[in-house]
Amino acid sequence: TRTPVNVTVTGAAGQIGYAL
């Protein structure tokens, strides 16, 4: 449940990529 910059930039796609 973190919010890295990657998620903020790419949105949902970034969140999925961060989880993987």
UniProtKB/Swiss-Prot annotation:
Family as reported in the entry's similarity comment: Belongs to the LDH/MDH superfamily. MDH type 2 family.
Binding positions for NAD(+) per the UniProt entry: 11-17
GO molecular function ontology, one term from the record: L-malate dehydrogenase (NAD+) activity
Organism placement in taxonomy: Bacteria, Bacillati, Actinomycetota, Actinomycetes, Pseudonocardiales
Function of the protein: Catalyzes the reversible oxidation of malate to oxaloacetate.
GO BP terms in the entry: tricarboxylic acid cycle
Disulfide feature: none
Stated name of the protein: Malate dehydrogenase
Catalyzed reactions: (S)-malate + NAD(+) = oxaloacetate + NADH + H(+)
Source domain of life: Bacteria
Enzyme nomenclature, EC number: 1.1.1.37
UniProt keywords, alphabetically: NAD, Oxidoreductase, Tricarboxylic acid cycle
Principal EC category: oxidoreductase
